[in-house]
Amino acid sequence: MVDYFDYKELLKRARSQLPEVVFSDVRFEIPSADSFVEGNRTIIKNFKDIAKFMERDTHEFAKFVMKELGTAGDMEGNRLILQGKFGWRMVNEKIQNYVNEYVLCPECGKPDTKIIKEGRIHFLKCTACGAMKPLKSL
C-alpha cells in the first residue's frame, strides 16, 4: 500500500528538521571591536580581523573610522591606535556605520558586495542582486 502525504505536512516535517540558523535573516554579524583606553589613546586590538571579515581594505576602513571619530591614528600590526579616549560603544557604532554605508547592499541587505571604480567614481556593487550604488569618497 502506498502512503500518500499531504504537501503541507511534508513541508512542515522537513522544516522542523532544519536548524534555527537557516531561518535567521542575520548571517552577517561583525565581530565587536576589542578596544581599550591606554593613557590618552584608544587601541582596537582586532582591527585587521574586522576588516578582513568584511573583505575591505584596512587603510580605507581605518581612514573612515578616524574621520568619523575626528581624530588621528596609526596602524600597528593587527591594531589601530587612535589619539584620544573613545568608549567601546562609540567605536562599535562607527564600525556599524561603515558596514551600513560601505558593506551592506542597499537593495537586498546582503553583505556580498565589492567596491569597484568606474572613471573617478566608486560604486558598491552587490554580487547577489547586481545593484550598484555610488559611494561618497573618503
From Swiss-Prot:
Keywords: Initiation factor, Protein biosynthesis. One of its GO terms (molecular function) is translation initiation factor activity. Pfam families: eIF-5_eIF-2B. The keyword Ubl conjugation does not apply. eIF-2 functions in the early steps of protein synthesis by forming a ternary complex with GTP and initiator tRNA. HAMAP family: eIF_2_beta. Belongs to the eIF-2-beta/eIF-5 family. PANTHER family: EUKARYOTIC TRANSLATION INITIATION FACTOR, EUKARYOTIC TRANSLATION INITIATION FACTOR 2 SUBUNIT 2. This is Translation initiation factor 2 subunit beta.
